[in-house]
């Protein structure tokens, strides 16, 4: 249909040019070559379109059923909050690198040191590293001599028995303790930081003016990716809350300005 339209249009155009232009009209050979090029372009376009349709049909016919996209369940978790694990032995390590957090560790042995770039001075470690503990104490004493003190005292440790947590939607989920991958299972460890005590000094946080402020040390949480399950199914990576810092919470005393 498009080829016939090109021929009719060019014949009409040629008739107009023949009436209005004498010496400046297009030569016969150039007009014929233009018609041929347009016809060839139209044929090539139709051929490519047909090939694309054939390729798409062949791909859909060979696509495995397991790879067919499924409609999300109504009321299910958002994609950003939940990433399923299809095969524990093939996808686990790849997704762990993708969602990696220094506070979450998959290992076949209990870690003995804090994650890289984290301070050693508040780390509650294993007796195996007793010499490092004494070194940290000497370092802390050296800081005290310089007059440097923390508003709140915190401690950090690897949690080895975490069984449940609250995810980003506020739902209770089960934290996978042991994951079977290949020959040796691995466990999931969480590096958490919390306050040693709510009031390091008599009136609250250290260094706060207690005449005008009420103060208290509180453990703060943040979200990390972890392998969890919900209702003993839907195993995957979710955002869960863990303890990550100790902060001083202030409130102004009544009647003070």
From Swiss-Prot:
Residues 61-81 are annotated as: Disordered. Seems to promote the survival of visceral and proprioceptive sensory neurons. Residues 19-138 form a propeptide. Belongs to the NGF-beta family. Glycans are attached at residue 131. GO terms for biological process: cell surface receptor protein tyrosine kinase signaling pathway; cell-cell signaling; induction of positive chemotaxis; modulation of chemical synaptic transmission; negative regulation of neuron apoptotic process; nerve development; nerve growth factor signaling pathway; nervous system development. Residues 67-76 have a biased composition (Basic and acidic residues). This is Neurotrophin-3. Keywords: Cleavage on pair of basic residues, Disulfide bond, Glycoprotein, Growth factor, Secreted, Signal. Residues 1-18 form the signal peptide. It is found in: Secreted. It comes from the Eukaryota. It comes from Homo sapiens (Human). One of its GO terms (molecular function) is growth factor activity. Disulfide bonds join 152-217, 195-246, 205-248. PROSITE patterns: NGF_1, NGF_2. Brain and peripheral tissues. One of its GO terms (cellular component) is axon. Pfam families: NGF, NTF3_N. InterPro entries: Cystine-knot_cytokine (IPR029034), Nerve_growth_factor-like (IPR020408), Nerve_growth_factor-rel (IPR002072), Nerve_growth_factor_CS (IPR019846), Neurotrophin-3 (IPR015578), NTF3_N (IPR045815).
